[in-house]
């Protein structure tokens, strides 16, 4: 049961953690499954038959051996194809991916002895290829799988907790309301829903081997909603990138943008690839609970997601270019200018989600690969926590608004219960309660005396960052 539990964790991790699992580096990294699903048996057998057909075709097409001295004849050993090999040579290939517990990054060896005969195992005197390394590191991978499994649960739980608090702050404090905060709230909601679905999947589906074997429609529906929310997550990131790019680069500082197009892109468009994927998956690759990543049909969803990330990457580059240009115009010291640029970039990176574009390939080295796994899993599973921290808890306007509300609450509490605060604390509380002390960071608040026909609308964001100055109309 331990092997079954962990193997499904690993299969799910491949599906959840990478924008596209068909990249070359990802295809060379599979994890052990001791109790594979029947559908995957069919897939593995088909791969083996295709490899056998290609091997016999290759053996017929290759010319005769041109070397001197004894050699071992080309052969199919049942799993892999071996070319003519000179005597005394140890040949090797990467492990096949027919079996879920085989690691294709490891190597298979086959020895041709000095007489030109393939090595035979002493126990049965039959030709033998050494496949022992293909699953030699299973215990180490199991231990690593458990760590990554619980890291995912902790990360998504912490993300839900912090995002709910952040969302509550943005909803409760109406003074923070503006178009950019509206985009924040929608993106926060996608993070919350996606993390909830992932936790349900990890807790209820992954360790439940009987449920996966029964393959109910409910687990596929859960998978559908996970894929949909994952796509919504990245497309709301794209909405944030488009909005920031419009404000900073296009410089539409004084006009309110039409948010309905953002709603259509963030919530509506992901339904298209997700629905197409579900239909084609049910017809062409209907594996149990749709846990397998051994299908190119995932490109239907991951292709648009990767496109959104690439677009956001170029948005980030252009935004940073504009920010650096603006900061140069302020004639500040060079070191301070680049410090601001780095700070602005580090704030925008988790928002635009470009870590998959900057570091999309897993290193083949074991140690570097393990470091990569932990770094990428931390970025992925704790991304909601990072976003909530950067865009809510560390935001100056949010901090000032919360402090002002807390100061007002303390004044009301003291007045109600008859406790008289000291003159120093009273002056500090009164100063914190001043509405004009709110720094411009999230959005530039318009004047309070708005026209009557604009009442109830959200104020447009005029200046998204302190370092951006409104250009004079010319």
Curated annotation (Swiss-Prot):
Activity control note:
Sensitive to cholera toxin.
Any transmembrane segments, and where?
147-169, 182-202, 220-242, 260-280, 297-320, 341-359, 368-394
- What are the GO cellular component annotations? acrosomal vesicle; amylin receptor complex 1; amylin receptor complex 2; amylin receptor complex 3; axon; cilium; plasma membrane
Q: Which cysteine-cysteine pairs are annotated as disulfide bonds in the entry? A: 55-81, 72-112, 95-134, 219-289
Instruction: Mention one GO biological process in which this protein takes part, according to its record.
Output: adenylate cyclase-activating G protein-coupled receptor signaling pathway
- List the residue ranges forming a coiled coil, or say none: none
User: Out of the domains of life, which is the source?
Assistant: Eukaryota
**Subcellular localization(s) per the UniProt record:** Cell membrane
Glycosylated positions are 28, 73, 125, 130
Q: Does the keyword Transmembrane apply?
A: yes
Annotated consequence of substituting residue 447 to P: Probable protective factor against osteoporosis
Which ranges of this chain reside in the Cytoplasmic compartment per its record? 170-181, 243-259, 321-340, 395-474
As given in the record, the signal peptide range reads 1-24
Q: Name one Pfam family in it.
A: HRM
Function, please? G protein-coupled receptor activated by ligand peptides amylin (IAPP), calcitonin (CT/CALCA) and calcitonin gene-related peptide type 1 (CGRP1/CALCA). CALCR interacts with receptor-activity-modifying proteins RAMP1, 2 and 3 to form receptor complexes AMYR1, 2 and 3, respectively. IAPP, CT and CGRP1 activate CALCR and AMYRs with distinct modes of receptor activation resulting in specific phenotypes. Ligand binding causes a conformation change that triggers signaling via guanine nucleotide-binding proteins (G proteins) and modulates the activity of downstream effectors.
Q: Which family does it belong to?
A: Belongs to the G-protein coupled receptor 2 family.
Quaternary assembly: Heterodimer of CALCR and RAMP1, RAMP2 or RAMP3; the receptor complexes function as AMYR1, AMYR2 and AMYR3 receptors, respectively, and respond to amylin/IAPP, calcitonin/CT and CGRP1 ligands. Interacts with GPRASP2.
Name assigned to this protein: Calcitonin receptor
**Gene from which this protein is expressed:** CALCR
